[in-house]
């Protein structure tokens, strides 16, 4: 930003200098008397360094004046933002909103629905097998050995499960799948016999 201001001021100074040279003949005579010296009928022109140094000094003075004028306004702006603490408001915009659940009257965060992992799904090491006989109602479990990849996957699922246990899920999301039945005409036929 300072470079942009410097270039703008430099352009203004150069444009002003060009306009001053061509504006009036009196000013051009004064400039010529100041800049040129005649010694023994030889005109000595000022070097480019002298011209450049005078323009640069003016530009530097102008930039310092602009910077000194900008500092109080920057301080006022920073004090304004510190006073109102806008950063807290911006942080609040990125957080999830708090929603009241009408079924359990608990505060829950409105996160996108992420399917939860049940503890039954996490126990991959035990597979349940049922005996196909009608007499027996017992359920036998058979233990299997897990490979390293399956163990790593199991650990990952356990971490996910522990992480999502920290969220307060609404009660209706937990119980919807338990009470939901398929709607078919055969389930709802009332017999009047």
Swiss-Prot record:
UniProt cross-references to InterPro entries, sorted A to Z: Alpha-s2_casein, Casein
Q: List GO molecular-function terms, semicolon-separated.
A: protein homodimerization activity; zymogen binding
UniProt keyword list: Milk protein, Phosphoprotein, Secreted, Signal
Tissue-wise, where is it found? Mammary gland specific. Secreted in milk.
| Predominant subcellular localization, coarse grouping | secreted
Q: Which residues carry this modification: Phosphoserine?
A: 23-25, 28, 47, 68, 123, 125, 128, 136
Question: Where is the signal peptide, in residue numbers?
Answer: 1-15
GO CC, one annotated term: extracellular space
Cell compartments where the protein resides? Secreted
**Protein purpose:** Important role in the capacity of milk to transport calcium phosphate.
User: Of which family is this protein a member?
Assistant: Belongs to the alpha-casein family.
Q: What's the name of the protein?
A: Alpha-S2-casein
The record lists the organism as Camelus dromedarius
């Amino acid at each position: 930003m300072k470079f942009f201001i410097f270039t703008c001021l430099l352009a203004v100074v150069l444009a002003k200098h060009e306009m001053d040279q061509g504006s009036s003949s009196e000013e051009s005579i004064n400039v010529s008397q100041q800049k040129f010296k005649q010694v023994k009928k030889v005109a000595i022109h000022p070097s480019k360094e002298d011209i450049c140094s005078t323009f640069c000094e003016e530009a530097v003075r102008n930039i310092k004046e602009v910077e000194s004028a900008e500092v109080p306004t920057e301080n006022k702006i920073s004090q304004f933002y510190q006073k109102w603490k806008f950063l807290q408001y911006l942080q609040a915009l990125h957080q999830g909103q708090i929603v009241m659940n009408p079924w359990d009257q608990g505060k829950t965060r409105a996160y996108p629905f992420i399917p939860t992992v049940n503890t039954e799904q996490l126990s991959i090491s035990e597979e349940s097998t049922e005996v196909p006989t009608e007499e027996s109602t017992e359920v036998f479990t058979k233990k299997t050995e897990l490979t390293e990849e399956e163990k790593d996957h199991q650990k990952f699922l356990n971490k996910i499960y522990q992480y999502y246990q920290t969220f307060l899920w609404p009660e209706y999301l937990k119980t919807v799948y338990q009470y939901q039945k398929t709607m078919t005409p055969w389930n709802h036929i009332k017999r009047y016999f």
